[in-house]
A protein has these predicted regions:
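Phosphate-backbone recognition surface of nucleic-acid-processing proteins
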Residues: 213, 219, 223-301, 305, ...
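Long, charge-rich intrinsically disordered scaffolds of nucleic-acid metabolism proteins
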Residues: 84-210, 214
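Short, glycine/acidic-enriched loop or turn micro-motifs at the edges of active sites
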Residues: 12, 66, 90
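Gly/Thr-rich phosphate-binding beta-strand-loop-beta motif of the actin/hexokinase/Hsp70
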Residues: 2-21, 111
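Nucleic-acid-processing active sites and adjacent nucleic-acid-binding tracks
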Residues: 24-59
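Acidic, metal-coordinating catalytic cores used for nucleic-acid/nucleotide bond scission
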Residues: 58-71, 99
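Short, solvent-exposed helix-loop connector elements
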Residues: 49-50, 124-137, 164, 168, ...
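Low-complexity, acidic/Ser/Thr- and charged residue-rich accessory regions of DNA metabolism proteins
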Residues: 257-258, 295-354
Length: 354
């Protein structure tokens, strides 16, 4: 059991930290800037407080808040410390006691208590590869441009029909056209940079070519799978785990004699990735003979549209995961099941789920 539990509450410009000695119950609190220098100051505080307890008995824990938690997590990992980034929802709903009000100091103390209580569930944070981080930034920037383009286009559509003539309207339309062209050019530059990042590593290049061989998977979906799975290392090539993160894996509820709920997808997922995958599914249904045949079988079996399309998304994840595992490109005769995929990880072909 770790003797020192360190709870970190991350924010944009600072972080609050509570250091707790679980043996005697003493603790201390401090606040530092969310920078590598702040991380260094925190380590000095822990060393002073621990009084001879080695770093092997320290457990850093914080909420996985995405960008805000990355700076300190990276610093501690590079220095060889054990830091556990946990889902904020899990920490919040583990407290038991009813808390009224909120402040950063209390939050960091609650995280330290959580780290001590659930130490057996702790898993060490692993730094994503440099390529995965770069792809993630490029994808985020591309999405921002796509959203901006959508806003500009929708503004033009709002012009009443009676006002679509005249010098002012002509100027607005010309301006909109120029902006959209500029955005499209920037999107092309970002996509070219993504391909350059992938080309720098042979393993990434191989995965990218395999993913693009699947009819329906374009550059954005291929880059998403590589970036968010760190080239499929993050989820251990487990199709079920990937589908869960993408928000298309069904989960049911079964308890006693009265609770028997139809499996449905959870809203705890990355909704943007799910939307991007929906685009791939729509394309595959039209152009991919394997997926088209599968989709038509579901429709013929009487499944509703939502169930059919969600199963298609699951099928795509199963197939591309098997393709990556085998190192094979897609063709119409590709078989996605193999001995390395246990039956418990596979989805029923026509499961009633959303």
């Amino acid at each position: 059991m770790k003797k020192i539990a360190i709870g970190i509450d991350f924010a944009k410009e600072k972080f609050d930290v509570t250091v707790k000695n679980v043996t005697n119950g003493t603790s201390c609190y401090a606040q530092y800037p969310n920078t590598p220098g702040g991380g260094r100051s925190m380590v000095h505080l822990v060393k002073k407080f621990a009084k001879g307890i080695t770093s092997e008995d320290w457990l850093f824990c914080g909420e996985d808040t995405g960008y805000y938690s990355q700076t300190i997590a990276r610093y501690l990992t590079e220095k060889g410390f054990f830091i556990w980034l946990q889902n904020p929802y899990a920490i919040k709903h583990s407290e038991g006691d009813i808390r009224r009000g909120k402040d950063d100091k209390a939050d960091s103390a609650a995280i330290a208590d959580y780290a001590h209580r659930y130490e057996d569930k702790a898993h060490k944070y692993e730094l994503p590869s440099k390529a995965a981080e770069e792809l993630h930034m490029l994808l985020t920037r591309r999405d921002a441009l796509v959203r901006a383009k959508r806003v500009i286009q929708s503004g033009t559509k709002e012009i009443p029909k009676r006002d679509k003539q005249g010098e002012t309207i002509t100027l607005i339309k010309a301006s909109t056209k120029r902006l959209i062209k500029d955005i499209d050019d920037e999107i092309d530059i970002l996509e070219q940079q993504m391909e350059k990042v992938v080309e720098q590593e042979e393993a990434l290049q191989k995965s990218y070519k395999i993913l693009r061989s699947f009819i329906g998977i374009g550059i954005v979906n291929a880059m998403c799978f590589i970036a968010y799975t760190d080239n499929f290392k993050k989820f251990e090539l487990n199709a079920r785990k990937i589908a869960t993160y993408w928000g298309v894996a069904p989960f049911g509820e079964d308890s006693g004699t009265s609770v028997h709920k139809t499996p449905r997808v959870s809203h705890f997922c990355n909704h943007w990735l799910k939307a991007i995958l929906s685009n791939a599914a729509n394309n595959a249904i039209v152009w991919n003979p394997t997926i088209k045949s599968y989709y038509e079988r579901l429709v013929k079996a009487g499944k509703c549209e939502g169930i059919c399309r969600n199963n298609v998304k699951n099928k795509i994840i199963q197939i591309i995961t098997a393709m990556i595992r085998k190192g094979e490109k897609f063709d119409s005769e590709f078989k996605f099941t193999d001995q390395n995929t246990p039956e418990s990880m596979m989805y029923p072909q026509a499961r009633d789920c959303w």
